[in-house]
């Protein structure tokens, strides 16, 4: 039986959040791009979640090829959101993301590349720093013909590497409206075509575990992972 399963998307409206609940998701990480982040938008989404019995958390996706800028953005938002994603594709950004345990997810490492965006060295970095690799269904679906086959191949290659080196993996619908939302059973069914069922289950549960970890780290008595003030 699955533990809590959270989708990763850009759903902020009440109808969309109700659809996520109806489809069977326990929670949602609604991410905004760093260029247009709005506290009001995510606060309203969290309110809709409370009213409809589904957990809604805040995510931030960083879209930048400037490593110094990325550091500044992560520092600015780390305590304001539950998950930080960095859009990959550029091999230097892929490495930068996987070297930092202050980020949570390397998003689309294969973006605009002829290869999968990862190798053994980078995957080991993700394992060491517990940075997840994202499988973005929206990126897969929006591509066609050869490009879709290339993204699917990248998924398969990255899954093989991540399983070998115990690097966490998340899967996201990436939906920005109700038509892009997928039911968790359908998402797991897709994963079952790529990996064994137990590994698919592990991937489905990873997003909620990241959120729980970040919520724990925000507690005032937690100085660092494994070190807490006990009164």
Curated annotation (Swiss-Prot):
UniProt-listed Enzyme Commission number(s): 3.1.26.5
GO biological process: tRNA 5'-leader removal
Pfam families (UniProt xref): RNase_P_p30 (PF01876)
Keyword list, A-Z: Cytoplasm, Endonuclease, Hydrolase, Nuclease, tRNA processing
UniProt GO molecular function: ribonuclease P activity
Subcellular location: Cytoplasm
InterPro entries given in the database record: Pol/histidinol_Pase-like (IPR016195), RNase_P_comp-3_arc (IPR023539), RNase_P_p30 (IPR002738)
Keyword Nucleus: no
Function: Part of ribonuclease P, a protein complex that generates mature tRNA molecules by cleaving their 5'-ends.
Assembly, per entry: Consists of a catalytic RNA component and at least 4-5 protein subunits.
NCBIfam families: RNaseP3Mthcoc (NF046108)
Protein name per its UniProtKB record: Ribonuclease P protein component 3
Organism: Methanococcus vannielii (strain ATCC 35089 / DSM 1224 / JCM 13029 / OCM 148 / SB)
Source organism phylogeny: Archaea, Methanobacteriati, Methanobacteriota, Methanomada group, Methanococci
